[in-house]
Amino acid sequence: MRLIICLELVLVLFLSVSCNKTATVDSDGQRCDTVGLKYAEHINIIKCSKYDIVELKDPWKKGQVLHKYVLVHRKDSANIKNLPEGTIVYVPIKSSVVFNSSHCQLLSWLGVSNLIKGVCDKQYIKLEDIQNGLKKGTIADCGSSIMPMVERVVDLNPDIIMLSPFENASYGQLEKVGIPIIECAEYMETSALGRAEWMKFYGLLFGCEERADSLFNVVDSCYNKLKKSAQAAKSHPKVLTERKTGNVWYCPGGNSTMGKLFKDANISYAFSNDTHSGSLSLSPEFVIDK
């Protein structure tokens, strides 16, 4: 039971450092270092003296870029010339609208939940500080993450919008309001620790880089200890995941973060041999038969 609870904690961290760096020089003569990541496969972080570059790989289209961000340090913004191409985000950010409960939880652990000014899908957010903010009116209800209240988001004028993208996703009017959209695609990583490592990106955004690095190191150590313990366990509990939505039952692919988590936890999962990194759209009858 203790093992399962601890594994759930690690999962929530991202339902919720390598010191190796490669030095380059940009067009403005700044020294830039590529941060070596231990597990994450779909993100690159390049740190320069006055800005950082974060490149998100498209997990659905191999070899293509999903989004490129240029994080400009506010104190240096007036003196920077020749910025590279990409979505400009001034950091540390001072306010945000967050579409997913998992990111609300992570920002709370990073100590920056006070910078959340609006949320979507409030019924799924169980954090006391978020619920109190909604009651007091300091945090706005922006509706559903599928159909957000765009006008309310615009009225809040946040520095960024954090949401989870989908393949060929279009954000409609939200793309036209001039607010940087942070595409949080960490759920498409192929390991739980790869997914968790994206907190380093969010640490850069919110000005809590050291705290994010420290938290990730704790998660990394804890997860691997639990994995070793789980592999030695003699029992292999079976798991049934998710739930029926209409006529479809979505289950994690065997190569997804959840699928890999089940393997690491030594849990018997019906689709563990599947090779997909996303979710599987299955009939309820098929899932029950498995």
Pin down the residues of each PLM region.
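Short, structured coil segments at secondary-structure junctions
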Residues: 112, 177-179, 265
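Bacterial Sec-exported substrate-binding components of ABC uptake systems
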Residues: 19-104, 211-240
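Alpha-helical, coiled-coil/dimerization segments enriched in small aliphatic residues
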Residues: 250-280
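Ligand-binding pocket segment of bilobal, Venus flytrap-like solute-binding proteins
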Residues: 55, 63, 280-290
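A short, structured surface patch at a secondary-structure boundary
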Residues: 52, 60-154, 161-166
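Extracytoplasmic substrate-binding proteins
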Residues: 138, 149, 155-249, 272-273, ...
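Bacterial Sec-dependent N-terminal signal peptides
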Residues: 1-26
